[in-house]
Amino acid sequence: MKNPKAAVLTMEGTNNEMEAYLSLIHSGASAEIVHIKKFENSEKKLDDYDLIFLPGGFSAGDYIRAGAIMAARIKAKLIRDIERFVDDGRLVMGPCNGFQVLIELGLLPNTEGKWETEAALAQNISNRFEARTIYIRVNNNKCAFLKRFSEGEILKLPIAHMEGRFVTRDEKVLNEIMSRRMNVLSYVNSEGKESGYPWNPNGSVMNIAGLCNEKGNVLGLMPHPERVFYKFTESDWTRNRNGEGTGYRFFLSAVEHMKEKF
């Protein structure tokens, strides 16, 4: 197929749009940055894209709660299009604020298939903004964005958030997430073992750092792969200057998946 087409969906307060755009372009996708208004007024259509990227930042200033207003705008006019987009097997990725939006929309974890909100990303257990590089373990590489990683592989990725503590509506939802291996990314310490704060920077239940839906085409995570697409943007890049940044494999996995599928 020709290069997969991706849209980086923005609104007031989002950030890292350019990092996401360049990551997609340099992984072989055709990408553009699109304001949510263009989808709301039908200037653009979701059906014209193979991947939607919901960027990080503080959409609408994170008023009410993180991601709530952006999710409300999507629900008002675009929710059926988004649901069809996912059902068709096309890809959605949301780091940080994007993850918060996906949770609000019910696209993740969506264990009952009802597109209802089953979880939340609450205030960090430290009650402060956490911004640093952390260790992440890949638990399941069946997700379209993780195919270039090995299960059990330990990654170093940056975080920057105030509301990242993953909690579920009830024990049943959490049990479904764990039994279906939807907890594709976990916070770990430098030895690759699950631990508490500060290794788990927000106090997420079961050290969950990222979720993928059961279909494998929607990924939400608190870390920012787009910030470490290039080797020189990694915090310890002077220790090993060879190869690509860790984020590169997230985007290459997605582009290769789309080329194979479509």
Residue ranges and their predicted role:
Residues 1-95, 99-109, 114, 122-130, ...:
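N-terminal beta1-alpha1 cap of cysteine-dependent amidohydrolase-like domains
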Residues 2, 39-44, 82-84, 118-262:
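Amide-donor transfer/coupling interface in amidating biosynthetic enzymes
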